[in-house]
From Swiss-Prot:
SUPFAM superfamilies: Ribulose-phoshate binding barrel. The keyword Amino-acid biosynthesis applies. It comes from Azobacteroides pseudotrichonymphae genomovar. CFP2. It is an enzyme of class 4 (lyase). HAMAP family: Trp_synth_alpha. Pfam families: Trp_syntA. This is Tryptophan synthase alpha chain. Signal peptide: none annotated. The alpha subunit is responsible for the aldol cleavage of indoleglycerol phosphate to indole and glyceraldehyde 3-phosphate. PANTHER family: TRYPTOPHAN SYNTHASE ALPHA CHAIN, CHLOROPLASTIC (PTHR43406:SF1), TRYPTOPHAN SYNTHASE, ALPHA CHAIN (PTHR43406). Keywords: Amino-acid biosynthesis, Aromatic amino acid biosynthesis, Lyase, Tryptophan biosynthesis. Its EC number is 4.2.1.20.
Amino acid sequence: MNKITTLFQNRQRNIVSIYFTAGFPQLNDTIEIIKELQINGIDMIEVGVPFSDPIADGKVIQASSYKAIQNGMNLKILFKQLEAIKSKIQIPLIIMSYLNPIIQYGFENFCEDCHKIDISGIIIPDLPFEEYINEYKFITDAYDLKMIMLISPKTSEERIRLIDSNVEGFIYMVSSAATTGIQESFDEQKQEYFRRINSMKLRNPRLIGFGISNKETLTVALENASGVIIGSKFVSLLAEENNPKKAVQKLLAELK
């Protein structure tokens, strides 16, 4: 069974998923970061593929992408790194990438290689939903990859229900229609959006991302979702500490 499915079926508490950019701060940090996150009880990990034009990302993740590219990170290297730790990772791994690097690699080749190294899901923020359904869903299904779709405050109820009925795994609730980034708190408008989606009683569990950075934002998000995704905050700590173990410990301390 897919590890994402197993995680949500067996969960005893809210899910915490962490995002980081592969190849940042250093090219070979990927393995250590994943190991440290798993050791410290993180439920799921999103590994970002660096891209030169990351339109959905704020300054922190953009900067990490540029640095990772300078370090030499690409999909081929990432797959080699993940292959090396495949047998030691029990939690779900998700690859987050813009469409261009995947097309360059070959979409089916990408999915096949993800399957070989036990990747559970993929997120492609610039892949239109209709294009996914018409051109790519049969491929991801063939390799047991959960396609994680994003929704935002601007996504209509009709579209949310359409997404919910056509995907499995979980739905990624973006806390704002802007780019990723760190927020100290969620205003009433964002909280109303969380409550609105919660009241829709969707089939899929939902994780809230974009802006989770401290105990306050974590608590508010968990009131209206099955878990959270933390990205910019962790990437900024990786940049600050330049030490994966210290960055993980500092993140967990700030969320308590």
